[in-house]
Amino acid sequence: MAKEKPILNVAFIGHVDAGKSTTVGRLLLDGGAIDPQLIVRLRKEAEEKGKAGFEFAYVMDGLKEERERGVTIDVAHKKFPTAKYEVTIVDCPGHRDFIKNMITGASQADAAILVVNVDDAKSGIQPQTREHVFLSRTLGISQLAVAINKMDTVNFSEADYNEMKKMLGDQLLKMVGFNPDNITFVPVASLHGDNVFKKSDKTPWYNGPTLAEVIDAFQPPEKPTTLPLRLPIQDVYSITGVGTVPVGRVETGIIRPGDKVIFEPAGAVGEIKTVEMHHEQLPSAEPGDNIGFNVRGVGKKDIKRGDVLGHTTNPPTVAADFTAQIVVLQHPSVMTVGYTPVFHAHTAQIACTFMELQKKLNPATGEVLEENPDFLKAGDAAIVKLMPTKPLVIESVKEIPQLGRFAIRDMGMTVAAGMAIQVTAKNK
């Protein structure tokens, strides 16, 4: 059997009207991942509902409710092959109320494609676009490319393309720490397929790669197999005749049958009996693998979602308190000492209290603007000291970046995102 192509997870980010789902649908179709008959059927359905042109988007928007609203809600995963990779697309939602999904979606991505509407050069960069790029950066995505879409609406004008490209570079990418010179921009018309998989004859002034070629130029992720084992628990099942079976995704390290393990903050200790993926037993599992495993000596009631598994020789860190760098995305008022919103870190959701506001930073450069500010508001970046109200596993991003990032939610929205830069471990 031929060696399978490496998998690359690519997040598609950007404003809801930029044509992300259509871009993704076009990649899937031209990449041979969709039966063309399906597109014909969806086109008919789209026309009947008065949404002609939405047929590619329908491929990603599998949920019926989304189809009627024309909005992508859950994070949809679809695959297509390029010359080099088996690409898994993480189609991140665009609407504000789905930013939480964006956070859980983007953190699984190795690279991101920002899709923008060329017409935004006239109206300015959409706030959502800023937020998505900023979040992607905060969540550790360092590889980014930009698809400037809907080029057909400006007659494939090079001037409009260059104006949009300059605006994105000056007003967005530089601000969040991406160097525009290292980012590939592609003029596309996803609805018609121009420069997505196939070179377009309508952009003779553009001699760069197609979007599919840009994806092939991304670097594959290095699996963090040498870091300590960390596996956040998503669910715990009790299976008759087998016993307790926790499931989750290996974030770092390697897990094997026979390993002595500990779940934190639960403190439950056991031994791995078997490791399974897709109903097959494995001799070991590594980062990125979604697995179920059977543990000797641990009952279903001993552990829960949000616990993190590690080896007994290097247990996950339970934080007494931690210092973090955060970015306030949106907040109706201000954040002060004593504020206690819910932190979403890996699979855990725990309220944490702001103990100290140590420094306010320039979000674009990281330089200190103010020591010990009285409050933080939307748009601020800061260094803060936090204390979990219940036991929480979190690691410093310097040591185990996969377990150092978090989102802060309050009032039904994501108010901030950040990363732990120093963690004080709880004494046992």
Curated annotation (Swiss-Prot):
Binding site for Mg(2+): 21
Region annotation G3: where it falls in the sequence: 91-94
Segments of this protein annotated with the region G4: 149-152
InterPro entries tied to this protein: EFTu-like_2 (IPR004161), EFTU-type (IPR029459), G_TR_CS (IPR031157), GTP-eEF1A_C (IPR054696), P-loop_NTPase (IPR027417), Small_GTP-bd (IPR005225), T_Tr_GTP-bd_dom (IPR000795), TRAFAC_GTPase_members (IPR050100)
GO molecular function: GTP binding; GTPase activity; translation elongation factor activity
GO CC annotation: cytoplasm
Pfam family, any one: GTP_EFTU
Subcellular location: Cytoplasm
E.C. number(s) listed in UniProt: 3.6.5.3
Gene3D superfamilies on file: P-loop containing nucleotide triphosphate hydrolases, Translation factors
Annotated HAMAP family: EF_Tu_A (MF_00118_A)
Function: GTP hydrolase that promotes the GTP-dependent binding of aminoacyl-tRNA to the A-site of ribosomes during protein biosynthesis.
NCBIfam families xref list: EF-1_alpha, PRK12317.1, small_GTP
Family recorded in the similarity comment: Belongs to the TRAFAC class translation factor GTPase superfamily. Classic translation factor GTPase family. EF-Tu/EF-1A subfamily.
Protein's UniProt name: Elongation factor 1-alpha
Organism: Methanococcus maripaludis (strain C7 / ATCC BAA-1331)
